[in-house]
Amino acid sequence: MKVLVVDDDYAVLDAMKDILEDEGYEVSVAANGLEAFKELAQGPPPCVILLDLMMPVMNGWEFREKQLEDEGLAAIPTIIVTAHNKPEVNAAELKAATSIRKPIAPALLLETVGRYCV
């Protein structure tokens, strides 16, 4: 199953990619929302999108707004991944499936992704 990870912090991006690939997921990565849309246009949709909010070029809020405008993309569960104090508030505001707070615990990442990639 394919997962799209969108984060401009390459250490976080690489860590999530390694954790997910070790569990057998196929992982695509993007450093901002614009790159994420390019990834989404290239192949079958991922079972879930892990989305950071604070990024250059196109941030997570902008990405999510445009994602929700497209019926097909809006159907992909999106998990907000953020260092903000109340990530659940961001998830609700953005109509996301749920949220994970940074720093990311590997077990929580796998459990959360596993809920949407069955």
Residue ranges and their predicted role:
Residues 29-48:
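Acidic, metal-coordinating helix/loop segments flanking the phosphotransfer/catalytic sites
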Residues 79-81:
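Hydrophobic/aromatic residues positioned on beta-strands within the core alpha/beta folds
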